[in-house]
Regions:
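Position-specific recognition of the canonical hydrophobic site in helix A of tetratricopeptide repeat
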Residues: 2, 29, 33-36, 63, ...
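Conserved structural position within tetratricopeptide repeats
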Residues: 15-19, 49-53, 83-87, 121, ...
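Short coil turns that delineate tetratricopeptide repeat
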Residues: 22, 56, 90, 124, ...
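Canonical tetratricopeptide repeat
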Residues: 30, 64, 98, 140, ...
Length: 259
């Protein structure tokens, strides 16, 4: 009835059903669905919670409640829901990841990392090197470590857990970023040069290299020399020729590459 635009009649019928059986989790769940349909999310959450008290094992009600909680940014409530869903289906990696994300959204990065570590400790056999889901989980955990400000630990984790990661480019980019933040200058320079060798058209790599080299924004000639090097190394590279035009002016533009 609600899908046919008869919202008032649908609510009236749901209330009649509740009067007939106040302890029916199905009636309360449907009541919550009706409130969600009219975007009254607070009342929908109340109805879902009541339905869940009547039927704590209902995965569908728990899932609907969790979706509304995250939509309403009720992070603590979302954590409780995700923990319940994890206890019900602890064998699924997505249950652990979802709980970690809940803690992440609530601002508790350390607990989010702990949840992912706890899942790793439940594994009897190491994941396959071709397991894409595991690769993504490793990178997510690495981002949590880095967001906590522990760059040294993040680099160590990237080197160990990420060495077989399927997204090799992401690993190389993060490694260069971490080395630069740790002020390991020579290693950072080498890492960014390797990235430019992979893709000489990406501006971010040049920016990272110049920053790692410690070149001042006003040192136009030194910065130009970096671009000249790669313009000569990769004759068909447009970025190495174009990017210096963002800061060069006057006589600095004169030369074999820019003439």
């Amino acid at each position: 009835m609600n899908s046919q635009g008869k919202t008032d009649e649908a609510f009236a019928l749901a209330k009649v059903a509740l009067q007939c059986d106040m302890k029916s989790h199905v009636c309360w769940h449907v009541y919550g669905l009706l409130y969600r349909a009219v975007k009254n999310f607070e009342e929908a959450i109340k109805a879902y919670k009541f339905a869940l008290r009547l039927e704590p094992e209902s995965a569908q009600i728990q899932r609907d409640l969790a979706l509304l909680q995250i939509q309403m940014r009720d992070y603590q409530g979302y954590i409780i829901s995700r923990r319940s869903m994890l206890q019900a289906r602890s064998g699924l990696r997505q249950s652990w990841t979802a709980l970690a994300v809940a803690h992440h959204l609530a601002g508790d990065l350390a607990e989010a990392e702990r949840v992912l570590t706890a899942y790793e400790e439940t594994l009897k056999n190491p994941p396959s090197k071709t397991d894409f889901e595991n690769s993504e989980a490793v990178m997510y955990k690495n981002s949590l470590i880095a967001e906590q400000g522990n760059i040294e630990k993040a680099l160590e984790h990237l080197t160990s857990a990420g060495k077989h990661n399927l997204d090799r480019l992401a690993v190389l980019e993060l490694r260069a970023t971490y080395l630069a933040k740790l002020e390991r200058k020579e290693e950072a320079i080498k890492a960014y040069r390797a990235l430019i060798d992979r893709n000489s058209e990406y501006k971010k790599y040049y920016d990272g290299l110049i920053e790692a080299m410690g070149l001042a924004a006003t040192d136009h000639m030194a910065r130009k020399a970096v671009y000249d090097e790669f313009a000569e190394k990769y004759p068909r590279c447009d970025a190495a020729r174009r990017l210096p035009l963002d800061f060069l002016e006057g006589t600095y533009l004169i030369g074999p590459i820019y003439a």
